[in-house]
Regions:
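Bacterial N-terminal signal peptides that target proteins for export
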Residues: 1-8
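Short stretches within intrinsically disordered, low-complexity N-terminal or propeptide regions
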Residues: 8-9, 262
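C-terminal motif of bacterial Sec signal peptides marking the signal peptidase cleavage site
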Residues: 15-18
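Structured soluble/peripheral alpha/beta segments that form catalytic or ligand/cofactor-binding pockets
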Residues: 20-369
């Protein structure tokens, strides 16, 4: 994530170049120029534990944080869609020394992603914001940048209302009825052999209902959604490139869900893996690195270009074999091979289907290709 953080900050320098005091603060923040090894904020404390509703809110002591929803949806006419909604918080003031009293600057930068896809099309949008455009509260819960919002409908955390609209695409969904689950050791999720870690919890079995607009046409939809919450000072080591992450909800609801990720080294080989098997009742079995392996079975060559990059051909995996202790081999395949978010920070985020030892559907995220 240090690699991603550095790229995000670079983008913000350009995006906010006319804004004060952001640029003044960024220019003073010399550690951010010292390379991808720079750690922002305090490492998460393994023994602190999670507390709710407090931890639904922001954690400014750690440098990177997100509120992340993915959903597999089916329309009344049988068409299927995927939706991603994410709010990222990035700390620029890693020593928490910001003294600016303006409501537009609190030492944090924010950006949000909204993506929506069919089996053949994928559309992604982004927004950047300063503190005056953002509201993050633990109770009643709200995570909002301008009019892109994830918020509790009442005092309790669930149900949630997800809203986003851009051009001819929108999502207005109600998300309800999922247990809260903690990954790793009661939420402390180790990411590397070197000990990088995050706090990580999820609502993996959300029932989604509402409407979406795709290319100007509105659909009534139902389906399954997954909410991830994570924060850290550094998720990966500077020698590592990124990760492949999967969330899977079983077709047979009684079988629960599965989360797995594998961190890749500088040669794009899988370096460190971890998984969680989640029962339908929300009981988690943490599965350690030695019991998880991932193998790419098929790739797709795609041309990538953003406003910040020149065109380049990149190979993305679109089919894998996941081996997890306790299951027969699991085959994972992308629903839409070109699920790239071609945004300021390009990455792949799209729906998957699984066969073999765990039959279901879900989402994959590929960062650092």
């Amino acid at each position: 994530m240090n690699r991603l953080k550095a790229a995000v900050i670079f983008v913000f320098i350009g995006t906010l170049s006319a804004c004060q005091p952001e640029v003044d603060q960024i220019s003073k923040n010399k550690p951010m120029h010292s390379g991808f090894a720079q750690q922002f904020g305090e490492p998460v404390n393994k023994y602190q534990g999670l507390s709710f509703p407090r931890d639904h809110g922001a954690h400014h002591q750690q440098g990177i944080e997100w509120w992340y929803v993915t959903a597999n949806l089916e329309a009344d006419n049988g068409d299927t869609f995927g939706v991603q909604w994410t709010l990222f918080r990035l700390s620029v003031d890693d020593q928490n020394t910001a003294t600016e009293t303006s409501p537009w600057w609190n030492g944090q930068l924010y950006f949000a992603h909204f993506a929506i896809q069919s089996d053949t099309q994928h559309h992604a949008f982004e927004k950047y914001g300063r503190s005056g455009q953002v509201n993050i509260t633990a109770q009643p819960f709200e995570a909002r940048l301008d009019d892109w919002q994830l918020a509790s409908k009442e005092a309790a955390f669930l149900p949630l209302n997800l809203k986003a609209q851009q051009e001819n695409y929108s999502a207005n969904l109600v998300l309800a009825n999922s247990p809260l689950v903690k990954h790793g050791e009661q939420g402390y999720s180790q990411k590397t052999h070197q000990g990088h870690a995050s706090y990580y919890y999820s609502y993996p079995f959300l029932q989604a209902k509402g409407n979406i607009t795709f290319a100007g046409e509105t659909y009534q939809v139902t389906g399954d959604a997954w909410l991830d919450r994570e924060w850290s000072s550094a998720l990966i080591d500077p020698s590592q490139n990124g990760w492949d992450w999967f969330s899977i909800q079983a077709d047979d609801k009684k079988q629960g869900g599965l989360m797995a990720f594998c961190i890749r080294n500088g040669k794009q080989s899988y370096d460190y893996c971890s998984a969680s098997h989640i029962t339908s009742g929300g009981v988690v079995r943490a599965i350690a690195n030695n019991d998880v392996t991932l193998q790419v079975l098929k790739t797709s060559e795609l041309t990538t270009q953003t406003a910040q990059t020149t065109p380049s051909n990149k190979s993305y995996p679109i089919k894998w074999q996941l081996n997890v202790e306790g299951f027969e081999p699991i085959t994972i395949e992308a629903r839409n091979p070109d699920s790239r978010n071609q945004l300021s920070i390009p990455y792949w985020e799209g729906r998957i289907k699984t066969q073999g030892g765990f039959k279901g559907k879900g989402y994959a995220e590929l960062v650092g290709y």
